[in-house]
Amino acid sequence: MLQKETQKWGGDPAFVDALNSVLTGPADILATRVVSLTKAYSTPFSKVKAAGNGFTIERHFYKEVTGEDGKKNRLEIFPGMKLSVGDKITAEYRIWNQENRSFVKLTAPREASFRPSDQLSGAYGWWLRPLAVNGVWSVTPQGYRDVKTDRTEYWFDVYPEEKTTVTEDFFITQEGIFTAPVVTIESLYAPHYRANDAYSGEVKTVK
């Protein structure tokens, strides 16, 4: 029933077997009720803390750098580090999902100085890619990438469980001090399963 709560089964005959197993189960199972409460409020970016139910999400930034050997590498960016106009930046959204879920939306706001290297919306994902961290492999789920003026939205019909990574490349186009809302992920089929990252601070850019 947990899977039924977060997945669209459609006309799969397995639904009948699952329903029968519940109806013939113990009385305490039949007495189970689920209540979902939602609260919306406003708070300054700086006070937003990481939170989640069934999901976790983190955003990490990396700058493309060229080593002495001429090979391109990635340097992780931490709060307080200055970036320059023209720098190529990769945003990496690291997601953990407790269960396979249907109809999931990832919303990734961006600072005004960031311009996506690929500004066209379209299909996204379903490849294996090596992470720079510890050389492990990560699955990139398949979905649709919708590029908007201030954010990128990712829509997934099915989102796999466990650890996945979504990435996006940007170029720095303006100098100044910039900030943006936190990245969020949510199951549209069961909205009480969601997560947001903590506020990561301002981004400073120079010419």
Model-derived features: where do they sit?
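Long, domain-scale non-catalytic interaction/scaffolding regions in large secretory-pathway
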Residues: M1-K207
